[in-house]
């Protein structure tokens, strides 16, 4: 169901984009490459060119891409132009204790547009893709019932994939068991927990890296709860939750050199504008088991600085390196896993600014 319908939002979006910076693989007759004429770009929003077109379907826009690619700015402008509301689809931006290190949208944005599922959950609360999907689905339906356009912004591939294509319904894990497994992990660490998992569920152990704490704990919990491998549930038919909606996916894909530059600049800004104090407060108020598993880049490095294991410059440099590596993995994932999408490309800040300057004005 990844297709255009008869609304004009993507047509208007593409209409203002410069010739060189966009291509789409959502056209009936092949891709629009760099240098394509504006006339051919207009076809992206033409319902005659789209598959599975249905005027009865409501639209959802998903704006995805690597960290520091400009998603928040573009999404905000899109929401202002098309009477939209924004929903978070980033697994780390749900936590209320870490808005700075996760680069959550600024308060100034939230005075102009309604934002949902940002910074609402405590780190001590259990959260999963299933819980996210339930909340996101509720928000999407609320927004469309108000006659507005839901715009989801983020870079968490698992959430996006599950929302668009469906999910494997793994039984809920009891809170008592979750607490037991987390306490066990704190006591014995990753390597020994992985060894235990290998005895119970060799299939999961063969697919999960010992250093991937979150997946390791999750797989152990699932086996303890169900007696089955977490991967056995992936062979079951996926449950579709928004089959009556039409997804339109826009992928921001900056040129790599520029992306790495924006990653470095963002981390530098975040470190200077409160991230150190933010993580210091977490370290003071919470037990290590509540924050050591968080995957937001920068937390691990700042903790190393606070513990005296790195200088501030070393922590920043390490965080920048890890952010660039993460961004590269995100780009690869979106290129390979999401086929029907519109891709926006730009090589520097000037191109990005010019490309998106008043892109949604109806002419």
Swiss-Prot record:
It comes from the Bacteria. The keyword Chloroplast does not apply. Monomer. This is tRNA dimethylallyltransferase. Signal peptide: none annotated. ATP binds at residues 65-72. The record marks 156 as: Interaction with substrate tRNA. The gene is miaA. Catalyzes the transfer of a dimethylallyl group onto the adenine at position 37 in tRNAs that read codons beginning with uridine, leading to the formation of N6-(dimethylallyl)adenosine (i(6)A). Keywords: ATP-binding, Magnesium, Nucleotide-binding, Transferase, tRNA processing. It is an enzyme of class 2 (transferase). It comes from Rickettsia conorii (strain ATCC VR-613 / Malish 7). The keyword 4Fe-4S does not apply. GO terms for biological process: tRNA modification. Its EC number is 2.5.1.75.
